[in-house]
Amino acid sequence: VNNRAGRLRQWLVGLAAGLALGGAQAALHLELDTQGLTPAQIQATQQLLDEAQVLLPPKFKAALDERIPVRWSSELLEEAYGEADRRNLLLNRRLLPSLVDGSDTRIQTGRPHGTQHRELLATVLHELTHFYDRERVWTPEQRQLILSCGGLGLTSDQLPLKCQGQAGRSYTLSDDPRLLDLAGWQVKTRKHGNRESKNLFIARSPDLYEVTNPKEFVAVNMEYFLLDPSYACRRPALQRYFAEHFGWSPAHDACPGRYPYLNAGNDFGEAPLGWLDPERVYAVDYLLAEGNEQVMSRWGHSMLRLVVCAPGRPRGPDCRLDLQYHLVLSFRAFVNDVQLSSWRGLTGSYPSRLFVLPLAQVVDEYTKVELRGLQSVPLKLTRPEIADFLERTAQVHWSYDGQYYFVTNNCAVETFKLLHDGVARLAAAQLDVITPTGLMDALRFKDLVDTSVLDDPREALRLGYRFDSFRERFQAMFKVARERLKLPQADVEAWLALTPQQRREQFQRADLRASAALLLLEQAAYRRALLQAQTELKDRYLGEDAVDKARFGKAGGALEQILKDSGYLSRPAELLGTDGYGLPQPGEWEQLTAESQKRQAHLRSLRDTLNNEVRQLLSPEARDGLDLTEANLDLLGKHLRELNKASGGLELK
């Protein structure tokens, strides 16, 4: 107890000193050490420092109440432009001659800011930001919150939600919880506001030095906030954050207001590049795929649905009927070797990336193939919150390269983080759960979703708030066939488990209604056989039998190339190389369109090669299963047409 009291007194004294400094009002003064410098060197250096000061926000200059010594040093590493300790700003003396003769404005460095002069100017701004960050420039409300939360943190093991991330703060910006949200040091689930140690927003970074730690992130981003007019469009949330903090913003470009994304759908005939336009998004839903008995699926799958209005339709409830335009945001373990290993999922060996998919594909994937239902419940978001969320979605899509853990960083955790970081109000809600159904319950408990849309099952189906598993439909069809044909099987699963020959034995006895039911069931059997064939090919292709693997030949090469080349669908930044950062801007859209179309055409060609070759690679049992099921479909179709004609119906072709 005495130790805790002592720590409390020590913390209060330190905080009081910091608050006193933060409240002081004085002008920044950069004091050049002129010893050993010629008049020309002094003049050129002073012009550089004056140029930097003109760029700084007024609040920044007023809050730094100290004289900061500036001197040229010969002791810095050759590649370093400068550095700052707690008292001095040092610049690399090797850069002084070109500053004096003006050639630094023409020397291209290959670094993010271009010329040597711009890099040197950025260095001064960067290092001054470290001084400002240490100054604890807080508003009175922030000071009071930090003071009260800091005291609680030293006297209690449990902090209220508003204090998480506030207790023990020591910096103006770099330990602000909202800054950390936007920067990419995401909150951990069930860890009372603790943060991930790594920042995984590494794609489309202007300078990977920024993810070293939050202090460097703030300093690097201040460079671009002050020097790059496109920063407001490339990193709009951070630009607003800095502008709000300083009560000031430099001039910046007008932003296009929509964000490109790569469509990760499996139809290679569709345009690969799409656009997230906040003006066309009516609502955002939490989309839950219900669980099944599979070990990786028993708790469901968390996704988010964008209710996108058809072109020309006014934004409103009718947009819910424009299903062909709706999109799904789904975090998945992108498996570039097509192998789903529970062990690798537990150890984080899979990358985790945000896929943007057409709703129709997702509905088919879950309801028809996996036989799982979907629930789609609207999130209670305002129009500005929807716009902020879409902006964050685009940022994650282009920049995030996470690690997928089935328990601690799965689809539910990633979806929670997207909501937490994308909508400031949701960051204040305690939603940190680790299962998809748990996230649904948390959203419902916090009154953040409207689950009343599910109260009337028929209306929920009609309006697209629910998509039933085809299992119920298949069971209903099987019930029709069982009653009419006196089938011995108890349920649809038992019927589908029969061989194609065993199912065929019942076809000739079927009347019109039973034949229609059997046709739908045979289509389900065919989808199941295709899935089993794909699984067999995957297991053999990835297996250890070299002789077996060698049989893949041309098809194996196509499969391997598809797996390699489709990686850009989950990491779209690959299409733009190393130029640019943040959200792609109009000047990059043409390259993005051309490169994505080129990649997609190549994938389409590879897919055709694979389709033509792959059936011969199946085991005789799998190949026969597909062939016989296709024959069953032809036979049932012919039988159904004959029965329909005999009953006086229209002749079906």
Regions found by a protein language model. Give the residues of each.
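Bacterial N-terminal signal peptides that target proteins for export
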Residues: 2-12
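Auxiliary, metal-adjacent structural segments of Zn-dependent hydrolase domains
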Residues: 27-102, 164
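Glycine-rich catalytic cores of cysteine/serine-nucleophile enzymes that process amide/ester linkages
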Residues: 82, 88-123, 151, 280-371, ...
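Activation targets extended, charge/polar-rich intrinsically disordered C-terminal tails
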Residues: 103-109, 119, 134, 138-210, ...
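Catalytic glutamate of the conserved HExxH
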Residues: 123-135
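Active-site-adjacent bridging/hinge elements
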Residues: 189-198, 274-281, 296-297, 301, ...
